[in-house]
């Protein structure tokens, strides 16, 4: 009985610890769990899509249900799965890579997570409250303004809440990388995952405000009767396209750049070579970020903007392939001549190269404005997009999860299960999407819930569906791997791969709450590798052992986010029910009173005294 009470108390305290944490490592786990959950939700929606399209005139889903599932699949995967899973790895790794004890603003870090989480929950509650959004993940104004029910309203309000969390996270990482680097960690000594996080965070800072403006205008149109996008009353639907895509295309680079950073960490470790062309890689990252804001109109070649606009954006789109090509060749030259160890993470990294190149080639094909009239709104675009996002972002996430899992949890994922999962996923991915290039060229439009027999589309769609089941099996095996590792996996040391090059591999696995007992002194690029080559057993400390200041946990980020969650329901049902307006004020009251409490209550954190630090933990082991 006593043991049961103790276990219950322990579970309760662990739950409270995660609800109130401001520790970047625990917030990384929260992002990983929430993002993983939404990834499974988006995957189930994808399976529904592929089952519906497995044969002509299938009745597995109705037209309306298909539109809702298709819309929520794209929205969930982009905003609620890929982004938070990348934030999980950023939170887990970036402070360690730069030799910091936490991010610049731990409280805001927690707030960013809870805003994302409540925004995602709000969006998915639409399934149970009258129907999900049904206008596609791009929610073009001509469709969304005339959508019945509240599905689009859930889309607009949910994305505004979660988008605010993303914007906060981007600002936080910018401040962290600028201000929290260890002594000697100059910009040109930053690991490339940190560099890509830095540039992606800058893109977030400039890309998300246009989306926020567009969502706000759509909210005003739908809930308050304005006409920004209604052409019948002087509005312009093309304004929505511009606002969405000037966010939407940088969003692709917000996703792919951190994945590039992951590959740039994984490949040198398992090729056992220094990354080829570090300076050119940094240049390419910055150039991709800059050019990413100059190509959004290639999504709008068929809207009638004219040949001059189309030509300018076509050239800019083709130009962005140049820095990407630089990165591809540098990764190949890093592998060339290396003593390559093919772990699961390395398999994902190596397979990414041909997969992503194929996605890039079809991207350049789509950049030809004249040809785009044939490709536009067909499955050719669907195939291109998924080759970039799955072949780039998802492969990067899977490589990063296998690579840094032991750093986050202290145990290595089972390699045999990991490799079987990789083979299933790789085969399933190419089975699903390669054939879609040809299905699209044969004329199959995207976003349609069925197709007629006798058009030559049956075989291609069936192959795509079979491939999707391979991918589903791979994800299930990955979940089995995670459970098996948590139960039976063995604990590992600071550098489980034995060839770690950067500072995260100098601390224990998982790291202590304070990360570094003494901040390390960085003597060059790949600082741990430098110390290993010099025969040193530990990093050179940059400071004497002293008391370590730590931030207190807080429940306030969760309460602030919950207040906006409540207010969103009031705004949604304001015109339907009398309780809508009071609920708005209650929700905003919760948020603003909590913010006021945060402002007036002094919270100076606490100190871990140097006498409490373990003597055997140097904090910066090599």
UniProtKB/Swiss-Prot annotation:
Heme a3 binds at residue 384. The chain crosses the membrane at residues 28-46, 69-88, 111-128, 160-178, 197-215, 242-261, 285-304, 313-331, 347-366, 375-394, 422-441, 460-479, 553-572, 581-604. InterPro entries: Cyt_c_oxase-like_su1_dom (IPR023616), Cyt_c_oxase-like_su1_sf (IPR036927), Cyt_C_Oxase_1 (IPR000883), Cyt_c_Oxase_su1_BS (IPR023615), Cyt_c_oxidase_su1_bac (IPR014241). Binds 1 copper B ion per subunit. Residues 1-27, 89-110, 179-196, 262-284, 332-346, 395-421, 480-552 are extracellular. Its cofactor is Cu(2+); heme. CDD domains: Ubiquinol_Oxidase_I. Cytochrome c oxidase is the component of the respiratory chain that catalyzes the reduction of oxygen to water. Subunits 1-3 form the functional core of the enzyme complex. Co I is the catalytic subunit of the enzyme. Electrons originating in cytochrome c are transferred via the copper A center of subunit 2 and heme a of subunit 1 to the bimetallic center formed by heme a3 and copper B. This cytochrome c oxidase shows proton pump activity across the membrane in addition to the electron transfer. This is Cytochrome c oxidase subunit 1. It comes from Bacillus subtilis (strain 168). The lineage of its organism: Bacteria, Bacillati, Bacillota, Bacilli, Bacillales.
